[in-house]
Every structure is written in structure tokens, then in C-alpha cells.
Amino acid sequence: MYDVKGNLHEVLGSLPAGVSLVAISKFHPNEFIEAAYAEGQRIFGESHEQELAKKVASLPEDIQWHFIGHLQSNKVKYIAPYISMIESVDSLKLLKEINKQAAKHDRVVKVLLELHIAEEDTKSGLSLDACRELLESGEWREMPHVQICGLMMMASNTDDEQQIASEFDEAAQFFDEVKAKYFADDDAFCERSWGMSHDYHIAVKHGSTMVRVGTTIFGPRIY
């Protein structure tokens, strides 16, 4: 078996105080998750609601599941009963649906607003202006079953570490702007989710409070 235990501790040991780890377990078997769980890891990230449902049914109840992939509004109802955080909110429509479905289960679902800062068109997320527009509308203030806890983004897929760092900096500056304008008195708005296996070491130097690491811990994905 892949050395999940050793890899996990290596990643955790490299994170500064105050940075949490989302172990990205999509396409990895339950025994890998159980190995990380046995070492104290509790936050795991998935991006397919059907795969997630199977894992939720068969793994410990105190795992905090984060949804990290593109989420269609019509799929929210399947994860609303148990999801801990949805990191990939990229529209007001999706936010409304999360609030609606969470209400049915009398839950408050934590969410992050996903930004699109990277150069690739393939990455989803809100442009900075679209994010400002969503927040300016104020509609989210009328959603008692959703708690906006911060921002999420992916840097461009490049070997240029300066570019990656500048994109993380741009996200960090935008976080400060949004925090001051809309969430100054809201301690829950505190998360900056950026950094993955190939660039989390840069992200933690540029404002990240939450890194999403899979391959470095679990090895290549098993499709």
C-alpha cells in the first residue's frame, strides 16, 4: 500500500501553524482514507456526489467532508444532508440552492466563494468583479442556512513559481478587500483555500489558511 501515513505526516509537518489540510481523497479507496484517519486527519475533499455518498455511508461519522469540484445546482440535494463545506460556490444561483436544500435538513452549510484568477479558461469560478457583484447584491445576507467562510482558488498550471505566487497574492489582497467591506465583524469569514500538491509550499507563504493536497499523500489517482 502507498505510504499514506508517512506522506501525511510529511505534509502536516511542512504546514505553518494555522494552516489546515484538506486531504483530497477523490478516486482513492476507503482504506487510504482510513489510514489517514487513523493518524488524526479529519478533513477530506471529494468532487463527485455519487462517490462521496458511498464513502459517507461506510466511513467514520466525524469526518468533515469538503466538496471541491464543480457543483451543479441539481446535485446539491444529494450532499446537503452531510457536507461540511462546499468550497466551489461560483454563482448566486448555486448559493441559493445550497441554502434551500440545507434548510430542509435544518443545517447551516459552510461555503467558500471560488475565484477564477488563473489563466486557463478551463478553471471554473467567479471573476473578481463577479464576486464583488454577488456580495454587493446582499442576497446572501438573507440565507440563514449558508455561512460564507472565505475564498477558494486554483493557480495556473505552470512551472513559473513567480506567476503562481502573484496569483496567490492577488487572491489574498482580494480577500482583504472583501473581508473589510462585507465581513469585518464576521469571524467565520477567515478561510483562504489555495495550494495543491504541486504548489501548496508557495501558497502557505502567500496567505493560504487551507491547502488541498491529494497526490502527495495518496499517490496517483485510481480511476
Identify the residue ranges that each predicted region occupies:
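Gly/Pro- and small hydrophobic-enriched strand-loop and loop-to-helix capping segments
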Residues: 208-223
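Conserved alpha/beta-domain cores
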Residues: 1-198, 204-206, 218
